[in-house]
A protein has these predicted regions:
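A sequence-level detector for low-complexity, Ser/Thr- and acidic-rich stretches
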Residues: 1-112
Length: 112
């Protein structure tokens, strides 16, 4: 992700794994962990987007506001709402336990 504006940027980042099965993806990553890096520094991570109630409400609203992939309550998909300064960032998805493999989709949106 490149944030090129001079102001901070509000972003929604998603790592979709188990929800892909509804679209016929057979080898979907069952429990993704999403990490956002600035260089080699991990600045945020999430596993299971709907664990914290306040974050669940904000994330659900951000997905509606941006037209992002809808997440089912209780799913093991991962999501982060971030405020990023200008710069370059990397989104990385891995299995939550470090050994799980499969197909995942990463989406990143600007939140209005």
């Amino acid at each position: 992700m490149i944030v090129g504006r001079r102001l901070k940027h509000h972003s929604l980042a998603l790592a979709i794994g188990p929800s892909l099965t509804t679209f016929g993806v057979a080898d979907a990553l069952a429990d993704p962990r999403l990490g956002i890096f600035n260089g080699a520094t991990l600045i945020a991570e999430n596993d299971n987007w709907s664990i914290v109630p306040a974050e669940t409400v904000a994330t659900a609203q951000a997905t509606r506001d941006t037209g992002a992939f809808g997440l089912a309550n209780g799913s093991k998909d991962a999501a982060l709402i971030l405020t990023l300064a200008p710069g370059a960032y990397t989104a990385q998805v891995s299995g939550a336990d470090g050994t799980i493999t499969g197909v995942a989709l990463i989406e990143v949106y600007e939140v209005p």
